[in-house]
Amino acid sequence: MQEIMYLAPELVLVATGLVILLTGVFLSPQSKNILGYLATLGTLAAIFLTVKSFGLLTMEGFSVQYTIFSETLSIDALSQFFKLVFLAVALIVSIASIKYTENSDHTEEFYTLVLFATFGMMIVASANDLILLFCAFELASLATFALAGFEKQNARSLEGAMKYFVIGSVSAALMLFGLSFVYGATGTTSIPLIAQNPGLLTGNPIGIVAIVLLTAGFGFKMALVPFHMWAPDTYQGSPSVVSALLAAGSKKMGFVAAFRVFIIALAALQPDWQFMFTLLAVVTMTFGNVVAVAQTSVKRMLAYSSLAQAGYIAMAFAVMTPVALAGGIMYTLAHAFMKAGAFIAAAAVVWMITSEKTGNLDIPDHLDSFRGLGKRMPLAALCMTVFVFALAGIPPTAGFMAKFVLFSSTIQAGMTWLAVIAILNSALSLFYYARLVKYMYFMPPEGKTEKVSIPFPYAAALLVAVAGVLVMGLWPEPFVELAMKAAMVLVPF
């Protein structure tokens, strides 16, 4: 019974998803909005239970860790922190989707997939066994594959979903192949037991092969270059609320899995994978920012921006000090609020363009669609401004504080050159973020000019995301402390 209680947040999500799926069958499309509110309530309940368990873990000290179900699941500060990241994204997406799924015939399927995807991500965060880790990865991936192609009549959406599915399937095969090499060398799939037998991997060519395969497998989900090929098309083609879930939530699943597998299980091979992540971090952040400059689709620009942000988080693997790991972990939460909010703001603009049937209907998220947004939809423009400035690292936002912790710890570790590259990339990103702000506030609107009321679900989701960005920026101490406790699971202080 005690083990079940530790999984209460996950069970709440599954129960909510099943209730939504069964209830939706008996509701008319016009009555299905209630399902969005039910999904929101279920997510809020899961957040409450996760926060409560996080408090119990940290009350007794920094090193408290519980393992359940024959030590296949670990309940610790790292798992609970990432569960909060996933649930925060699910909350924002669930609220915004109340408008997106309005009058849809498939509302119940949509919310069930969102909640089941979040459930899979949360299991990945706690996975203490390679087999369970892979199964949870696939559960979340299958749900997001379906969500990416949710608009079956949209050719761009189907193209992005197909690329996501094909490349995702290949990456899953590579990941499973890498995990099998680790099992073959160590004789176990338990992450703690693998860590306790470092001699079985060091000096063994199988260990190097496993690192390469696992980097490719996890790199796909983290959208690290050159494993990013799916991301721009999928983020642009998917419904904006789904893009928010993928960029802000699903990507973090790859990071928490990599934290456990590389830093804990494969600690003996640190010199090898540390070099790989250093190279990937530099290439990813630079490529993402440079290509984002040339984009005219805002969602595609945000996709390449997500590559750059992944490069910043990957710096934690390159530096490998406790503070740098805490900075990378904190950045995942900051990025969740910033990126989810930015995609929801884009969703509001896409709704405005498609409902008015004006502008570029083929690419409704084109930069021209954002012309004069400050006058036409002031709240969406203001929130988008907060998000892009936070992504650029402008104070007093979550992005600034997370970058400050991560970059300063990189300098303290003696890797000043890496910090300089990251700072220059942040400066470059300010160009395309500022260009978007210019379009919203300093360029006249195309077509209609009258003010548009933003739908309540979009407004509520935006305000939740803005609150997260500003609270983390203005009051960072508790978030830094929680991130430090999570980092202690990986590297003892």
Curated annotation (Swiss-Prot):
User: What biological processes does GO assign it?
Assistant: ATP synthesis coupled electron transport; methanogenesis; methanol metabolic process
Q: Where are the transmembrane segments?
A: 7-27, 34-54, 78-98, 107-127, 130-150, 165-185, 205-225, 244-264, 273-293, 310-330, 333-353, 381-401, 404-424, 454-474
Q: Which UniProt keywords apply?
A: Cell membrane, Electron transport, Membrane, Methanogenesis, Methanol utilization, Oxidoreductase, Transmembrane, Transmembrane helix, Transport
> Which GO cellular component terms are attached?
plasma membrane
Does the record bear Metal-binding in its keywords? no
Q: Where in the cell is it found?
A: Cell membrane
Please state the Enzyme Commission number of this protein: 1.5.98.3
The way this protein sits in the membrane is described as: Multi-pass membrane protein
Q: Share what the entry says about its subunit structure, partners included.
A: The FPO complex is composed of at least 13 different subunits. FpoA, FpoH, FpoJ, FpoK, FpoL, FpoM and FpoN proteins constitute the membrane sector of the complex.
Q: Indicate the family of this protein.
A: Belongs to the complex I subunit 2 family.
Q: Kindly give the PANTHER family that the UniProt entry links to this protein.
A: NADH DEHYDROGENASE
Could you tell me what this protein is called? Answer: F(420)H(2) dehydrogenase subunit N
